[in-house]
Structure formats: C-alpha cells, structure tokens
Amino acid sequence: MVEIDTASPPFDQLRSIQRLASARSGHASAEHARHQLYVARDKRSRSNVLVKIASKPGLVYEQELTNEIDSLSTINRDLPDSRYFPVLWEHGRLRDSRIYLIMSLFDEWPLATTISADRTPVSEAAHIRTMIEVGKALMELHGLNIFHVDLNPMNVLGRWVSGKPVIRIVDFESSYEVARHANGVFYNPPTTSAFLAPELPLHAPDARSDLFSLAAVLYTMLAGYDWTWAADVARSVRADPEVAPELKEILLTSVDADPEKRYSSVVEFRAALTAYFERTWPGRLRQRAD
C-alpha cells in the first residue's frame, strides 16, 4: 500500500485523507496496482478532491498518470466552462519521486451502481436519456481531438437532478490526444476491458472507438453484465429479444467489429438515439430539457 506523509506537500494542505472506496473507483487496491486513490478536503478551498499517486517511482508506474495530466490540462484549458470533466488542481512529484495529481472529486457515482438485469420501460427510458447526455459530453471531448478510449460503467458517473441526468466522465489515463500521440508521444492503450473497441490496440483510437464503448455501456445498462462473460456485445445484442428492433439497429451499427461500418461520429449516434427516444416516449425529452 502507498504510504503518504501528511505533513509534507501537497498533503499538508489537505485534511480528512482516506482511501477511495472501490465501489467508487473501480480500481484495484492491491500493492501491485500502478497507482492508488485517495479522497481529501482541501484546506484552502474547502472543496473535496481526488488524489492519485503512482505506487512506485519510475516510468512504467507513471505513464498513465502523466497521460491523464496532459489530457486534462488540454481539456481544462480549451473547455474551461465544461462541467463534464474533472478539473486538474495540482500535479507534481513527492519527495520520493512518485508522481501525483489532485483533481476535483465529483458527487456522482459510477453508472455501474445503477445496472441491474431487471428491465422496465422506466429504466430503459432513463438509461437512454443518460446516454444521450453522455454523447453530448463526448461531442465536447472529440471536438478537441481527444478520445477517452476506456469508457466503461465505472468511468462514467451520473445522478438525476430535477428530472435531468448529470453526467461526468473520469479516468483519462488511457486517453488518446491526437496532437500529442500522433506526433510521437508514447501511447499505451488499455487491453483488458470488454468495452474496448476490437480494432485496438492495433490501430490508433478515434471517435468510433469511443462510440463502440459508449454503445456497449448502454447495452450493459439495459441488459446487465451477463454479455461480458458469455459473448461479444454484438452477438448478445443480435440475440436479445427484449431490445426493440430500432434500438437494436442503433446498437449493432455502433458496435460493429469493423469501424468503417459504425456511425462516423458520436454526433450521428446521438441523433439516432435521440430520434428513437422521441418516437418511443413523445415529448419526454423536451419536457426534461425545459
């Protein structure tokens, strides 16, 4: 386990420091994990913050955190008013050379905490409405030529406020920023997630990679996690009799193994999903937006 010196910077400016619960992080807490997560309260701003620390000094342990720092720096600079993404407060190295970063801690919980195998029209409407909002967040991100790459039910946070979904996207350790990575900066894509687009890691990520993951998350919210154990997502969607034909076509187009056959952008996917929602639940989307 990572040991921290609460009397040394940056921890001397924090209080109530504790490990982040696995239900909120989705990260392993074992000693061999590449980094550890803490929550704390900043003494200066009185805001809650998330602290990430590499478990050991060295390039192997800090590559993902360095990548997250760089991507969040671009996002915060170019989208200063966006509420979808974390704000990077501070980053640097501890006295023992381990890299750290401090960012905003959101109140929302991972979508994974809302997933159930029980299906109802009410839950389907809520899940689709949530994904429409996630699509809006990804439109902002992709406008910067940054792709998240590792979207899954733990990396998308959400809650409902006054009948509308509030969405956050976190964990940019595997993100791909074209301005950096297409020009020689080392990139190490994730390799284990069932939500990962199949063309990775052999090809560079693009918007269609995130689209695959987003549709896989939506199907998981609708049907539960069983498909992640039994088969690939396209096969499961195709065989699922409880998915409406129009929605099934949207999902299958999004998770096609060939990225050339997917929607070309999240904008196109979101438009198709919005049209389906409005035909299925007329007026609901406009009422929620008012």
Q: Where on the chain are the PLM-derived regions?
A:
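Catalytic-loop of the protein kinase fold
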Residues: 142-160
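Activation segment signature within eukaryotic-like protein kinase domains
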Residues: 130-131
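Conserved HRD-motif arginine in the catalytic loop of eukaryotic-like protein kinases
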Residues: 262
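ATP-binding glycine-rich loop module of kinase domains
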Residues: 34-68
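Short beta-strand micro-motifs within the conserved protein kinase catalytic domain, predominantly
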Residues: 87-99
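Conserved short submotifs of the Hanks-type protein kinase catalytic core
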Residues: 96-110
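Conserved activation segment of eukaryotic-like protein kinases, specifically the C-terminal portion
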Residues: 184-199
